[in-house]
A protein has these predicted regions:
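ATP/NTP phosphate-donor binding region
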Residues: 1-59, 69, 77, 171-172, ...
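Glycine-rich phosphate/pyrophosphate-binding beta-alpha loops
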Residues: 123, 127, 181-194, 260
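Gly/Ser/Thr-rich active-site loops/lids in small-molecule metabolic enzymes
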Residues: 138-146, 196-216
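A generic structural signal for short beta-strands and their flanking turns/coil linkers
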Residues: 160-162, 176-178, 201-206, 240-244
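ATP/nucleoside-binding phosphotransfer catalytic cores, i.e., glycine-rich phosphate-binding loops
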Residues: 168, 174, 199, 210-289
Length: 289
C-alpha cells in the first residue's frame, strides 16, 4: 500500500531535509512505495491530502499532535489509514500508542466535537488556556520544549475558573470549573498522564473534571497529573461516557490535540473503531535513528 508522508515544515525547522532524506532511505531499504508531501502552510494541508481521499493509502503525519489532528480531520470518512512519525514538541498521541502496546494495524476510536474530530484529548479550562498561551510565547530565548512549562506558570497567575455545565447519561454538573477533560488517549501537554487507564479501543471516553479549585491547590494536582496518580485526589472527579454536551457562559477555547476551537456549546461523542491506526515500529525507529 502506498505510504504518504505528510511532512510538517514547522515541526521540523532545521531538521526538515534530514528527516526527508531518512524517510527516502528507509523506504528504499524496506521496499515501501512512498510519496512525500511537504506542508509549508496549514491551509495547504487540505489540498495536499485531497488527491488521496478516493483511494486507500497509509497517511503518515511527520510532525506532532497538531499535524496528526489536521490530517485526521481531512481523512475521516475515507479508507485511508493513519500513522505518525513523532517529531513534534509534545507527541502525546504517540506516547499513548506506545504505552498501550498497539498492534501494527488496529482499528481505534475517534471522538467528534461539533464538526471536528480528535483522537487524543479535548480540554476546557486551565489546561486549554495553557495550551493556547504556549502559542503566544514566541521568545526565541525559550526553547520550544520549555514553552509549555513557561505557559503553565503564566496561566497560573492569569487564570479564572469557567462558568459551565455539562450533561451526559451518566452525570450532570454545573458551576465553576477549573478544568474539564475528555480523554480518548492517555497523555497531553507533552507527557502529562491525564487518563492513565484510557484505551483507544474500549469504546469509551474518560471524563475528568475539577470544580472551582483554589489556586494554591493547583501545583500539587499538576504534579499528580504528571505522574498519573491524580485519580485518587479529592479534587478530581472521573466518569466514562460515549457522549457529553458542554455549555459555557462565555465563548471559551477548547484545546483539541494541539489545536483550538472557540464556542459556547460543545457536543462530543465517541465514534468506535472509526479509523485504522498504522503503527510500524520498524519504520518509525529507523527514520528517527
Amino acid at each position: 500500500m502506498r505510504h504518504v508522508f505528510i511532512v510538517n515544515k514547522f515541526s521540523l525547522n532545521k531538521k526538515l531535509d534530514t528527516i526527508s532524506e531518512r524517510i527516502k532511505e528507509v523506504c528504499k531499504e524496506l521496499k515501501i512505495y512512498y510519496v512525500i508531501e511537504t506542508i509549508t502552510k496549514d491551509n495547504l494541508m487540505k489540498d495536499a491530502l485531497k488527491k488521496y481521499l478516493n483511494s486507500k493509502n497509509i497517511i503518515i503525519a511527520v510532525g506532532g499532535d497538531g499535524t496528526v489532528n489536521r490530517i485526521l480531520n481531512n481523512i475521516m470518512g475515507s479508507e485511508n489509514y493513519l500513522g505518525v512519525i513523532p517529531v513534534g514538541t509534545g507527541n502525546d498521541f504517540y506516547k499513548s500508542i506506545l504505552k498501550q502496546n498497539t498492534e501494527m494495524y488496529e482499528k481505534i476510536d475517534v471522538a467528534q466535537i461539533n464538526d471536528k474530530y480528535f483522537i487524543n484529548i479535548a480540554c476546557f479550562g486551565i489546561d486549554a488556556d495553557v495550551g493556547n498561551n504556549t502559542k503566544i510565547i514566541k521568545n526565541k530565548l525559550i526553547p520550544i520544549k520549555q514553552r509549555y512549562n513557561v505557559s503553565l506558570i503564566y496561566t497560573f497567575f492569569k487564570y479564572k475558573n469557567k462558568e459551565a455545565e455539562f450533561t451526559s447519561k451518566e452525570e450532570k454538573q454545573q458551576g465553576k470549573f477549573t478544568t474539564i477533560v475528555i480523554a480518548n488517549g492517555m497523555y497531553y501537554g507533552g507527557g502529562f498522564q491525564i487518563a492513565p487507564n484510557s484505551k483507544y479501543n474500549d469504546g469509551l471516553l474518560d471524563v475528568y473534571y475539577a470544580k472551582d479549585m483554589k489556586k494554591y491547590k493547583l501545583p500539587g494536582l499538576i504534579i499528580k497529573i504528571k505522574k498519573g496518580t491524580h485519580e485518587q485526589s479529592k479534587s478530581i472527579n472521573k466518569f466514562q461516557t460515549t457522549e457529553i454536551t458542554i455549555k459555557l457562559k462565555e465563548e471559551t477555547v477548547c484545546n483539541i490535540d494541539g489545536d483550538e476551537i472557540t464556542d459556547t456549546n460543545f457536543k462530543i461523542k465517541l465514534l468506535p473503531q472509526a479509523i485504522t491506526l498504522y503503527n510500524n515500529q520498524e519504520l518509525i525507529k529507523k527514520v528517527l535513528g
